[in-house]
Amino acid sequence: MKCEHIIWDWNGTLLDDVWLSVQSINTVLSRYELPQITTSRYLDIFTFPVIEYYKLLGFNFDTDPFEKVGTEFINEYTYNQYLPKLHKDLIKVLKEINDLKVSQSLVSAATQKMLDKLIHYHKLANYFETVIGQDNHYAYGKEDTVSKWLDARSLDPSHVLFIGDTIHDHEVAINSGMQSLLISHGHTSRERLLKTGTIVLPNLNSFIYWFKESTQ
């Protein structure tokens, strides 16, 4: 496998924030007297665009617009945004990728402002060539921003590896002509990820071993 650049997804892939997403949405659900969800249920239904996930949760957008409910979730999440930790072995993996002379970037469905704050807080900026966020907090998806980023680069998309934790991440990679790899410690169950047919690994440590073997 030839790989000149890696694009990492942020939430779930590098940041261990599933618990906060479940906690935050349950706070909002209780506000609307809707059933709480378990982490297992969350991993089985979370999807992009997240408006579809909100529909599965039971929200009625005729009475409570998605923009209102989505903002309430973001407010809950943002209040605790510095509590989630980085996934185990992340710093080691980022350093090893740099040592292999492979450049790295980061993309998220979060706003650019939130993403920049978190990258600074976790002292990760030096590892990434580019940090790509969104201009709104409604998490419609990443495909447009990633596509524009690729268009502005001289990279061959087939030599770029996109690493994420959702089916949407896989779709972004394939639709943009990139290689795809998924890690199952994030926002989607392993069973759902395997249905994409792409490589699914359990954690970051297993990824670095796979990457070294695959790029020899």
Question: Across the structure, where does each feature detected by a protein language model lie?
Answer:
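Glycine-rich phosphate-binding loop signature in dinucleotide/nucleotide-binding domains
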Residues: M1, D99-V102, A152-H159, S214-T215
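Acidic, Mg2+-coordinating phosphoryl-transfer loop and its flanking beta/alpha structural elements
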Residues: L161-L201
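Short beta->alpha linker loops
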Residues: I45, K85-D89, A110, H137, ...
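Conserved H-loop
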Residues: P35, A125-E129, D156, L201
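Short, acidic loop-to-helix structural element flanking the phosphoryl-transfer center
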Residues: Y79-L106, Q112, D116, E143
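N-terminal helical cap/lid subdomain that shapes the substrate entry/recognition surface
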Residues: C3-I91
